[in-house]
Amino acid sequence: MNGTARAPALGRLGTYRTDRSYAWNYEHGPAWAGPVPAVPATAGQRFFGLEVASRLGIAAGLLLNARWIDFYARCGYDILTYKTVRSRHRVCHPMPNWLFVDPADAAALDEAASAVRARARPHAGTGADWTSTVSFGMPSRDPGVWMADVAQARHLLAPRQVLVVSVVASPAAGDTADSIIADFGRLAAMAREAGAQVVEANLSCPNVVSAEGDLYLDAALSGRIAQALRQGAGTLPVLLKIGHVPDEARLAALLRAVAGQASGLVVVNGLSRPVLDGAGTAAFGTGRRQAGILGRGIHAISVQEVARASALIERDRLDLQVVGVGGVACAEDAERYFEAGACAVLMGSAPMFDPALAARMKALHPEW
């Protein structure tokens, strides 16, 4: 990389304005002045029994509402995940919500939970090179608002496109496991009623400090949640989004616990790390030292986990499939996930910087 290269201007990075609030992006985004790409024709594939034009899509996070889903559907993404919703209103964390990890720290990401440094502007390069860190806290509109918007999003999709709705429980202080399980079950039923074709439960948000952030680490509880989701979702496919599980025995136990209720797992939901500014204090502010890491720096770890989960599913003959997500910014990145055993590949931050990514992938790999 040329040492004289300049960092891109803040606010002109992609469809999500990182210099604006979540509320602004919800009301005014996606902020994209460029053209919508021409989308190549494909023969089509299956995604948990549903016909899709491709097994390429967008993970929970970027698609804030129906307007965002419509834009990315027209750009050629065929599996579209509505940003995580709750059974009650939840405000977003204050700004900043999206920062960029120092390249040296991003390159050194591994199993150790070492702190990383972050700043508002990315270093020189493009979105394919960047590792981001985010801290939103899984905000949600009231159910009446998001259910109507989900219905609108479903109406906007073309044939052979699938709407996934991501849900998460909202435990209050003193809530029991039973109340968390019941909340997930209610949400699955609400998502189904609103028009979801697939229900995804987020068991692993790396940027919240409340109990819903690490449910996937409890295999028995995850199994009970999967059962409640299955009851609420009816015949719809049920996916569980999990975080990084470096211990193979623990991952195997989780897979066995949810098999028979869940249809598959989405692997992985970023890495949780301490995120610091140049002065060594919490980059996102007081009480928000831990945040989610996504983008280039987590790709290798995420592919490895997909491969491990796929091997365990085959070994134990479980009726589960794995959806890969993490650090996909080119066709070669997606190919590594398919080779590792993923049935589909979702993208998180890269489509924000590069909406035409799926169209280029389809041109190279119409079989996907």
Put a short name on every predicted segment.
Residues 1-38, 105-114, 296-321, 329-368:
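Alpha/beta catalytic cores of nucleotide-metabolism and tRNA/nucleoside-modifying enzymes
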Residues 55, 162, 236-237, 264, ...:
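Proline-centered loop/turn at the N-terminus of a beta-strand
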Residues 60-63, 166-170, 242-248, 319-332:
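Glycine-rich beta-to-alpha transition loops that act as phosphate-gripper elements at the mouths
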Residues 76-90, 203-205, 264-274, 327-328, ...:
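Glycine-rich phosphate-binding active-site loops on the catalytic face of alpha/beta enzymes
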Residues 89-107, 275-291, 350-368:
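C-terminal helical cap(s) of enzyme catalytic domains, especially alpha/beta-barrels
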